[in-house]
Amino acid sequence: MMIQTAVAQAKTAPAGPGPWSIKDLVDLQYLDELMSIDNLDVWFCSLVGSIAIGLSGIFPLLVIPIEAGTALKTEAGCQKLKKLLSFAIGGLLGDVFLHLLPEAWAYTSSPGGSHRHYCTQGLWVIGGLMSFLTLEKMFPDEVGDPETKTSFQRTTSSSSDLSSQFSVSPQTNGICSNNNSDSKPKTDISPYTQPEKIKTSGYLNLLANCIDNFTHGLAVAGSFLVSRKVGFLTTFAILLHEIPHEVGDFAILLRAGFDRWKAARMQLSTALGGVLGACFALCSQSQHGAENATTWILPFTSGGFLYIALVNVVPDLLEETNPRNSLLQVLLLFSGIGVMALLSIAMD
C-alpha cells in the first residue's frame, strides 16, 4: 500500500531530480508483487516440483544392479549394459520425436501463418547436433599411448624375469635362494594401474540433461502460474516421462566410465537446471516468456540427444555379431520407443 501511494505521488509530482524516480518505485512495486503471499506459494510449489523431477535421477539405482569397472568388462556385464543402452537409444529417439519436437511445434504453430518457424526450429536441431559435435572435437577421449603401453609391458616382463632368477627350496624354509647371490626374502613387484578415464560422451549427456531439466522447470513453473491443479498434473506427467529417460541416461553414464554412485550424483546435479528454469519462468511472471525460451531450447536439446544416441551409443551396438543378441537389442530399442509413445499419449 505504501509503494502504491508513493507511485501515485511520484506520478503527480513535477518532473525533476529527486531521491526517488518513477522507475525506482515501479521496480519496488514489481518486487513487492513478486514476493507476495500468493506468489510465494507458486514459488514454493514450482521449486519443489522441479527438485522432485531432478530427484528422479536416483531411480535407476533401484533397477540397475550392475556395477561399473570389472563387472562391465566381463561378458555377462557387457551384455547387460548393451541391453540397457539399446533401451536408452529407443528412449532418446522417442523423447525427441514424440515429446520434445511436437511440444516445440505446438508452441509456435499458428493457423494460417507461415511455416518459417518450422525451418527455424530445424536449424536449432542442427545447431544442437553441431554444438555437441564441436564439444567432442574440442575435448576428445584420450586413446592409450603406445609408448606407455610398451613401458607397462616392459615393466611386467622384467618383473617376471626377476622372479624367475629365484627359486624356493624346502631346505631354505621358504627363503629364496640363488646361485649368484646371498639368500634374500622374495620381493613382490606389482605394476601401477591408472584409473579409468571418463569419456566425453558422458559429460555431453549431462549437459543435454541439464538443458532438458531447464525446460522442465519452465513447464512446471508456467503451469503453477496458471493454477495449482495444472501445476501438479504437469509435474506428475513429467515425472512419468522422466523415469524411463533417466534409466537410459544412467546406462549411458555407466558406458562413459562412471560408477553407479558417481553417476547418480551427477544425475542429481543436473536438477539445478530445473531450478534455474523455474526461477526464470517465475521472474518473467508470464507463460509467454517461458514459451519463447522453450521454442528454441527444446529443438536445441533434441539435436544434442540425437547426437548422443546415434553417434556415441549406436556404434557400440553395431559391434555385436551374435544374431540372437542383435535381435534382442533391436527389440529393446523398439520397447524404449514404445514406452515413450505410451507416455506421450497418456500425457495428452
Swiss-Prot record:
<feature type="transmembrane region" description="Helical">
    <location>
        <begin position="46"/>
        <end position="66"/>
    </location>
</feature>
<feature type="compositionally biased region" description="Low complexity">
    <location>
        <begin position="149"/>
        <end position="169"/>
    </location>
</feature>
<feature type="transmembrane region" description="Helical">
    <location>
        <begin position="327"/>
        <end position="347"/>
    </location>
</feature>
<dbReference type="GO" id="GO:0071577">
    <property type="term" value="P:zinc ion transmembrane transport"/>
</dbReference>
<feature type="transmembrane region" description="Helical">
    <location>
        <begin position="295"/>
        <end position="315"/>
    </location>
</feature>
<feature type="topological domain" description="Cytoplasmic">
    <location>
        <begin position="105"/>
        <end position="118"/>
    </location>
</feature>
<feature type="region of interest" description="Disordered">
    <location>
        <begin position="144"/>
        <end position="192"/>
    </location>
</feature>
<feature type="topological domain" description="Lumenal">
    <location>
        <begin position="284"/>
        <end position="294"/>
    </location>
</feature>
<feature type="topological domain" description="Lumenal">
    <location>
        <position position="348"/>
    </location>
</feature>
<keyword id="KW-1133">Transmembrane helix</keyword>
<keyword id="KW-0862">Zinc</keyword>
<dbReference type="GO" id="GO:0000139">
    <property type="term" value="C:Golgi membrane"/>
</dbReference>
<feature type="topological domain" description="Cytoplasmic">
    <location>
        <begin position="316"/>
        <end position="326"/>
    </location>
</feature>
<feature type="short sequence motif" description="XEXPHE-motif">
    <location>
        <begin position="241"/>
        <end position="246"/>
    </location>
</feature>
<feature type="transmembrane region" description="Helical">
    <location>
        <begin position="263"/>
        <end position="283"/>
    </location>
</feature>
<keyword id="KW-0813">Transport</keyword>
<keyword id="KW-0333">Golgi apparatus</keyword>
<dbReference type="GO" id="GO:0006882">
    <property type="term" value="P:intracellular zinc ion homeostasis"/>
</dbReference>
<comment type="similarity">
    <text>Belongs to the ZIP transporter (TC 2.A.5) family.</text>
</comment>
<keyword id="KW-0968">Cytoplasmic vesicle</keyword>
<feature type="topological domain" description="Lumenal">
    <location>
        <begin position="140"/>
        <end position="219"/>
    </location>
</feature>
<keyword id="KW-0406">Ion transport</keyword>
<dbReference type="InterPro" id="IPR003689">
    <property type="entry name" value="ZIP"/>
</dbReference>
<comment type="subunit">
    <text>Homodimer.</text>
</comment>
<feature type="topological domain" description="Cytoplasmic">
    <location>
        <begin position="241"/>
        <end position="262"/>
    </location>
</feature>
<protein>
    <recommendedName>
        <fullName>Zinc transporter ZIP13</fullName>
    </recommendedName>
</protein>
<keyword id="KW-0256">Endoplasmic reticulum</keyword>
<feature type="compositionally biased region" description="Polar residues">
    <location>
        <begin position="170"/>
        <end position="182"/>
    </location>
</feature>
<dbReference type="GO" id="GO:0006829">
    <property type="term" value="P:zinc ion transport"/>
</dbReference>
<feature type="transmembrane region" description="Helical">
    <location>
        <begin position="119"/>
        <end position="139"/>
    </location>
</feature>
<feature type="transmembrane region" description="Helical">
    <location>
        <begin position="84"/>
        <end position="104"/>
    </location>
</feature>
<dbReference type="GO" id="GO:0030659">
    <property type="term" value="C:cytoplasmic vesicle membrane"/>
</dbReference>
<keyword id="KW-0472">Membrane</keyword>
<keyword id="KW-0864">Zinc transport</keyword>
<feature type="transmembrane region" description="Helical">
    <location>
        <begin position="220"/>
        <end position="240"/>
    </location>
</feature>
<keyword id="KW-0812">Transmembrane</keyword>
<comment type="function">
    <text>Functions as a zinc transporter transporting Zn(2+) from the Golgi apparatus to the cytosol and thus influences the zinc level at least in areas of the cytosol.</text>
</comment>
<dbReference type="GO" id="GO:0005385">
    <property type="term" value="F:zinc ion transmembrane transporter activity"/>
</dbReference>
<feature type="topological domain" description="Cytoplasmic">
    <location>
        <begin position="1"/>
        <end position="45"/>
    </location>
</feature>
<feature type="topological domain" description="Lumenal">
    <location>
        <begin position="67"/>
        <end position="83"/>
    </location>
</feature>
<dbReference type="GO" id="GO:0005789">
    <property type="term" value="C:endoplasmic reticulum membrane"/>
</dbReference>
<dbReference type="Pfam" id="PF02535">
    <property type="entry name" value="Zip"/>
</dbReference>
